[in-house]
Amino acid sequence: MIIDNHVHVGWFTDGYHSPKEIWVSEMAAGVDGMAVASTSTCAELYKDVCRELRELIRFGGEKVHPILWLTPRMLKLNYPLPYMLHSKIKWQGIKLHFESHPEWSKNRALLNKALDVAKLLDVPVLLHTGNFEVSHAGRFKDVIQDHSEQTFILAHGRPIEEAIDVLLSCSNTYVDTAFMPMSDLQKLVEEGLTDRILFGTDAPINKVFFKEIDTSMYIQDTINQTYKILGDKADGIFSRCIYGE
């Protein structure tokens, strides 16, 4: 059983990635289920987001775990959030991206409103972590500790030392391996954090960086590399999914 906990669909900088493309690529790589957020959210294309997730659900049913990517604009306007929440899609996670939407870091009241949406839906919060300071894993430590009753996922685990510190300090936190260097994955294993790791690939964003590599091949290669690092611990991590619990 392999669950890809970090997948995208929709419009991105390199063009459009259709639900069929994503479904076929993941299945061809041997993936059994996926947690998916639509990158069309960044263009505030709410109808497209719902259409894309519905189509993926038609392909995979309960194998598809829809993630609702929230933007500040969605919470400021009257219609987007109610539209998404009443779309009959069973959202199983909330995503926040502080690099794409830096207002999250400047407006704590708005951030708390987003976290309230996750609390209302009783779903985990996926936080993009990256190389820009606004999205460093350590920047989220206070927020995570202040909301100890909620579950958080540090997407990518960057920088890894900060991600490890948050994981060791906050028992309500996981990390996903999307675009994570194998050396960082090894550090998580050495810290005894294998039970907090969620396998993820960030497909099909690989096409931005590795245009010549088919997405299904990229996913399969990521699976193979992960097996080499995790050994007999791999099966437990590949099958772990906290969305929809």
PLM ranges: what are they?
Residues I2-N5, A35-S38, I67-W69, K95, ...:
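Active-site neighborhood of phospho(di)ester-bond hydrolases with catalytic His/Asp-centered motifs
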Residues W11-S18, S40-D48, T71-N78, H101-K106, ...:
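Acidic-and-aromatic substrate-binding clefts and catalytic sites of carbohydrate-active enzymes
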Residues G192-K211:
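Short acidic/histidine-rich active-site segments
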Residues M1-N5, Y16-M34, K119-L120, T194, ...:
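Mid-to-C-terminal alpha-helical segments outside catalytic/metal-binding sites
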Residues D32-G33, K47-P124, S171-T173:
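Active-site gating/metal-coordination segments in enzymes
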Residues N5-H8, D14, E21-E44, K63-T71, ...:
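Divalent metal-dependent hydrolysis catalytic cores, especially in the metallo-beta-lactamase
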Residues I2-W11, L126-G130:
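Histidine-centered catalytic micro-motifs
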Residues G93, N107-L198:
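Catalytic pocket-lining loop regions of alpha/beta-barrel enzymes
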